[in-house]
Amino acid sequence: MTYRSKVAVVYLLGFFLDLINMFIASVAFPAMAHTFNTTPSVLAWVSNGYIAGLTLVIPFSSVLTRRIGPKRVILLSLFLFSAASAAAGLSATLESLIAWRVLQGVGGGLLIPVGQALTWQQFKPHERARLSSAVMLVALLAPACSPAIGGLLVQTLSWRWIFFATLPVAIVTFVLACLWLKHEMPAMKAARLLNLSLLADPLLRFSMLVYLCVPGVFIGVNVTGMFYLQHVANMSPAATGMLMLPWSVASFIAITATGRYFNRIGPRPLIVIGCLLQATGILLLINVSSATLLPAAAFTLMGAGGSLCSSTAQSSAFLSTRREEMPDASALWNLNRQLSFFAGALLLAQALNLAQAWLPPLAAWHGMFIFAAGMTLLPVLYVFRLNNTQVLTQLRQETS
C-alpha cells in the first residue's frame, strides 16, 4: 500500500468515527432518560456537547499542527477520543457524561481538519475528485448505519455500549497512525487561528457557500419537514423514516457520478444540476400526502441534488490551495461544515415561525419550503462567475 493510501485510510477511519458519534447517541436517549431520570431537552446536550467540543476546537487545529506536527496532533486526538469514549460509557451522572462528550468532540475536532489537510496534501488536484467521492461515501454510510447499530446495542446490551463499541475502531486507527504516518517537522512560525485571507480564493469561497446553501438547507428541511410530513401529510413515523432509503440510493449515485465526471466537465454544470434537483425536491413537498409517491420522489431528488453539490464542492474547494496552506484551509472548511449544520435548521425554523405569525398554518409551511428552495438556488447565481474553463485547463494540465 502506498503512503498516500495509508494516510487516506487513517483519515477515513477517523472521519467515520466522528460521524458515528455525532449520530448514534440520539437512539439511546430513552434508555439514558430512564437511567438518569431526566428530560429529552436536557439529554439533547449529550449530542450538543459533542458538536460543541468539535466546533470550538477546529480553529486551533492548524496552529497546533504547526507547533507539534500533524502526526502528533492526530495521535493526541485519537487518544482523547478513545479515553473520552471509555469514560462516557462509565459515566455515573448525566453531568459527567456531557463533559466526556465535550472531550470526545475536542478529539474529533482536532482529528478531522488535520487528517483532511494531511490527506489532501498527498493527492494532486486532478486526483481529488475520486478522493472526495470516498469521503462522501463515508459521510453517507455513517449516518445511515448509526441508528441501526445504536438501536441493536441498546436493545441487546446497554446504552453504555454505544460508546464502548467505537473503542476498537479508535484503537485500530491509533495503531495504524503510529505505524503508518511519517513525522513531519513542525513549522514553528506563529500562525493565526483562522487565516481568513484564504477566502480570497474564489473556489474555496464558493464551495463553502454551496455547503451552507445546499447540505445546510437540506438539514433544515429534513428537521422541520418531519413535523410537516407526520402532522400535515399524515404520514406515519415509520413511513417518514423510510424516506431516507431513496435519499441514500440517490446520494450514492450522485457521489459516484461526481467522481467520474468532475474532471471532464468541471464544477459548474454539476452545481447547476444539483441545485435544480434539490430545489425541485423541496418544492414537491408542498403537495405531498400519505397516499402518493411524491414524498419518496422529493427525497430522491434532494438526495441526488444535495450529494451532487456537496461532493462537487468538496472536490473544488482546495484545487487552488497550496500545500502549506492546507491546514488553514481545512480548518476553515470544517468550521463552515459545522456552521452549515446549525445554520440550516435554525434559519428554516425561524422562517417557519415568521410565516406562521402572518399566514395560515398550511400556507406558512408552503412559504417555508419556497424559501428553502430559493436558498438552495443561491449558488447558481454565483457559479457563472467561476471560470469553469480555467478549472478544466488546470485539471488537464495535471493529468498530462
Report residues per predicted region.
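Paired small-residue
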Residues: L80-A87, E95-Q104, L293-L301
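12-transmembrane solute porter fold
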Residues: S5-I20, A25-V27, F36, P40-Y50, ...
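Helix-loop-helix hairpin linking two adjacent transmembrane segments in secondary transporters
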Residues: V135-A177, A190
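C-terminal membrane-cytosol helix-exit motif in multi-pass small-molecule transporters
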Residues: L167-K189, P379-N387
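Cytoplasmic helix-loop-helix junction between adjacent transmembrane helices
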Residues: V102-V138
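Conserved MFS/SLC helix-loop-helix module at the cytosolic interface between two early adjacent transmembrane helices
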Residues: L56-E95
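MFS-fold secondary transporters
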Residues: A84-G89, Q104, A177, L284-I286, ...
